């Protein structure tokens, strides 16, 4: 089963929080101390919490649950996309558009427009337009792909959110809370853990740490999915008998 050890976390710098003056007092239970005015996160808390989160994500995935990866900070953007694609899940890695979850009906219309434009760009429709019209549609296509490309095949609301930075993605977390969608999130020492169902105290800036979380989550999701496929195969085998 996908798990992460304390050694893995130490090597990735998961224990380095933010400067002490930027701390959120609600994170006090997860802080070990401070060194050179930087908070040190207590990995004895983080390791079991992260592994519990991985086990739960695996369970959701084994029930065909959809996981939405959210990380719109520039540094994490590419890693978020890679991890989601790696486990055939969904992602938002540029700007979070307000209402992305709570106003799904409107988002669905924008996704339809995106898919229509994709077809037009491939079937020669763009070639029949004036240069200006073709350019405008290409720009619209790129803009929609940027914001909705990672969720265009989600087909409905996700069953869980995995968030890289609770502070930066507070709007996404609030929307998930309003809809009762469980939130799994990395929470650094400057962040508010309220609204996060599965708190993972850790560094949300170092790219090595971010990749460690994302790869472990992708592995857990893949394990859950293969468990689901194994059950399906077993059931069809029993029916065939």
Curated annotation (Swiss-Prot):
One of its GO terms (molecular function) is structural constituent of ribosome. Gene3D superfamilies: Glucose-6-phosphate isomerase like protein, domain 1, Helix hairpin bin. Pfam families: Ribosomal_S2. GO terms for cellular component: cytosolic small ribosomal subunit. Keywords: Ribonucleoprotein, Ribosomal protein. SUPFAM superfamilies: Ribosomal protein S2. GO terms for biological process: translation. Belongs to the universal ribosomal protein uS2 family. This is Small ribosomal subunit protein uS2. It comes from Yersinia enterocolitica serotype O:8 / biotype 1B (strain NCTC 13174 / 8081). The gene is rpsB.
């Amino acid at each position: 089963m996908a798990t992460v050890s304390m050694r893995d976390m130490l090597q990735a710098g998961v224990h380095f929080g933010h400067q002490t003056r930027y701390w959120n007092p609600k994170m006090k239970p997860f802080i070990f101390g401070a060194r050179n005015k930087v908070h040190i996160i207590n990995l004895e808390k983080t390791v079991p919490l992260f592994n519990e989160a991985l086990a739960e994500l695996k369970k959701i995935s084994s029930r065909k649950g959809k996981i939405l990866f959210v990380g719109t900070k520039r540094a994490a953007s590419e890693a978020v996309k890679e991890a989601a694609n790696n486990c055939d899940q969904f992602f938002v890695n540029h700007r979070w558009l307000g209402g992305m979850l709570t106003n799904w009906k409107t988002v669905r219309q924008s996704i339809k427009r995106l898919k229509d434009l994709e077809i037009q760009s491939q079937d020669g429709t763009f070639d029949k337009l004036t240069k200006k019209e073709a350019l405008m549609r290409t720009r619209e296509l790129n803009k929609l792909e940027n914001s909705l490309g990672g969720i265009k095949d989600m087909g409905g609301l996700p069953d869980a959110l995995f968030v890289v930075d609770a502070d930066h993605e507070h709007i996404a977390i609030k929307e998930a809370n309003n809809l009762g969608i469980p939130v799994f999130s990395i929470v650094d020492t400057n962040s508010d853990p309220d609204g996060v169902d599965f708190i993972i105290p850790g560094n949300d800036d170092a790219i090595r740490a971010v990749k460690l979380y994302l790869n472990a989550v992708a592995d857990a999701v893949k394990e859950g999915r293969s468990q689901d496929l194994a059950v399906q195969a077993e059931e069809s085998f029993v029916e065939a008998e």
